[in-house]
């Protein structure tokens, strides 16, 4: 018996993609693991938009997923917001146990209207204009020509998620359909993600592709002077050393520490976004990762001090990552959505034979003296050699980083730098 499938492709910082087509029956592992310190029941059972904290929900999911995808001796990068947002569009069409499992894993409220209103507000905040940086999130739905979607689902996608519907011919022109979507992705990501959907992925069985993008390009409030960037030693988790291009600055930054780790805030121009770097005091990133929860991260931030000069050393880094998220999400309890015999996406279409077959994730980050991604800025730079500093933040071994929207408290990106490399991106 043939069933229909949902393939979810998510590009970190850039795209989340949902395909609905057909899949053969398969067996799904039902192990469930959740590693959050958040009260799930309180979050998902609220019926009030005012009481539902979508940023806390997103951030709780962030740490749950990180605990599943962290990899020893490898760089890590993903956009929890992109995944959270794309799956919210998907969640809007779920019912029954499929809905309940996704609610538990993503901290979505069971009352869909609460999530819809909260998401609309979040999207509006993220997309508000600011000349100091580029930050935009977008949604789009690409549907098979003449395929029936529920009118209410289409209306919700447009009104709450700003998701416009475009008909495409997956059956007769799968390659052209792939090119159309990939070119849209390339445009929305400033050409940083190209050919996201692989050749042959879209075919006659594809019914719907849902894309969610979040793109960020910002410059530091306090830029690093490229003239004092030097090649310095960086010690990997296994003890090996490598030479990396390392930036240095002495400036006033928000800084904190406890017995295990140091935390530093590097704000971006525009005052709305910051990168937070968490550096273990010893070269033991695995131990930090194993105990890195939303509660611990929040406590580190709460104990940060202001007004002191900090000597900062961090490597330049740029890398791309790819991951398949089906397995970790199943471990987090999203089981039925992947099972063609159990999935219930009846809110999307009258066709009841839909299921997710796989979730793909791509990621890109570029951190250098000017900021994150590619950006140009001018400004006077103080010669930090002449300044006395109180604290030292020397990232010469693996560390974690988060890019956060301070208006909402929402973590947009999270990653680990295990082995920094830098290649100037065009």
From Swiss-Prot:
* PROSITE patterns associated with the record: SERPIN (PS00284)
InterPro entries hit by this protein: Serpin_CS (IPR023795), Serpin_dom (IPR023796), Serpin_fam (IPR000215), Serpin_sf (IPR036186), Serpin_sf_1 (IPR042178), Serpin_sf_2 (IPR042185)
Q: Where is the site Reactive bond?
A: 384-385
Q: Is Nucleotide-binding one of the keywords UniProt gives this record?
A: no
Checking Gene3D superfamilies in the record gives:
Alpha-1-antitrypsin, domain 1 (2.30.39.10), Antithrombin, subunit I, domain 2 (3.30.497.10)
Which keywords has UniProt assigned to this entry?
A: Protease inhibitor, Serine protease inhibitor
NAD as a keyword? no
Q: Which GO terms describe its cellular component?
A: extracellular space
Q: Name one GO molecular function term.
A: serine-type endopeptidase inhibitor activity
State the family named in the UniProt similarity comment for this chain: Belongs to the serpin family.
Q: What is this protein called?
A: Uncharacterized serpin-like protein MA_2246
């Amino acid at each position: 018996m043939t069933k229909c499938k949902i393939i979810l492709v998510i590009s970190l910082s850039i795209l989340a993609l949902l395909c609905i087509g057909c899949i053969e029956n398969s067996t799904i592992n039902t192990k469930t693991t959740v590693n959050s310190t958040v009260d799930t029941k309180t979050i998902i059972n609220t019926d009030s938009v005012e009481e539902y904290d979508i940023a806390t929900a997103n951030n709780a999911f962030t740490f749950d997923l990180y605990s599943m995808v962290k990899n020893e001796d490898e760089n890590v990068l993903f956009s929890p917001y992109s995944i959270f947002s794309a799956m919210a569009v998907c969640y809007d069409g779920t019912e029954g146990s499929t809905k309940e499992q996704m609610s538990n894993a993503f901290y979505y409220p069971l009352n869909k209207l609460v999530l819809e209103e909260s998401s609309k507000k979040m999207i509006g905040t993220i997309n508000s204009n600011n000349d100091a940086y580029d930050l935009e999130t977008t949604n789009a739905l690409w549907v098979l020509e003449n395929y029936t979607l529920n009118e209410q689902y289409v209306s919700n996608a447009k009104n709450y998620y700003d998701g416009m519907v475009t008909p495409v011919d997956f059956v007769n022109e799968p390659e052209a359909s792939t090119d159309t979507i990939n070119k849209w992705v390339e445009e929305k990501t400033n050409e940083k993600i190209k050919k996201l959907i692989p050749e042959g992925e879209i075919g006659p069985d594809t019914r719907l592709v849902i894309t969610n993008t979040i793109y960020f390009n910002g410059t530091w409030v306090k830029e690093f002077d490229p003239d004092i960037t030097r090649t310095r030693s960086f010690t990997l988790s296994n003890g090996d050393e490598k030479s990396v291009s390392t930036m240095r600055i002495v400036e006033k930054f928000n800084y904190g520490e406890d017995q295990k780790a140091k935390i530093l805030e590097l704000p971006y121009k525009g005052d709305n976004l910051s990168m937070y770097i968490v550096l273990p005091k010893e070269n033991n990133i695995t131990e930090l990762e194993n105990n890195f929860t939303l509660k611990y991260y929040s406590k580190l931030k709460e104990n940060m001090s202001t007004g002191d000069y900090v000597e900062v050393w961090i490597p330049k880094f740029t890398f791309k990552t790819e991951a398949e998220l089906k397995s970790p999400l199943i471990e987090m309890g999203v089981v039925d959505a992947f099972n063609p015999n159990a999935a219930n996406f009846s809110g999307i279409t009258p066709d009841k034979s839909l299921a997710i077959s796989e979730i793909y994730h791509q990621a890109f980050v570029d951190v250098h003296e000017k900021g994150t991604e590619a950006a140009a800025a001018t400004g006077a730079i103080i010669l930090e050699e002449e300044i006395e500093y109180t604290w030292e933040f020397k990232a010469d071994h693996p560390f974690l980083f988060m890019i956060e929207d301070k208006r909402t408290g929402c973590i947009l990106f999270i990653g680990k730098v295990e082995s920094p490399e830098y290649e100037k991106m065009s």
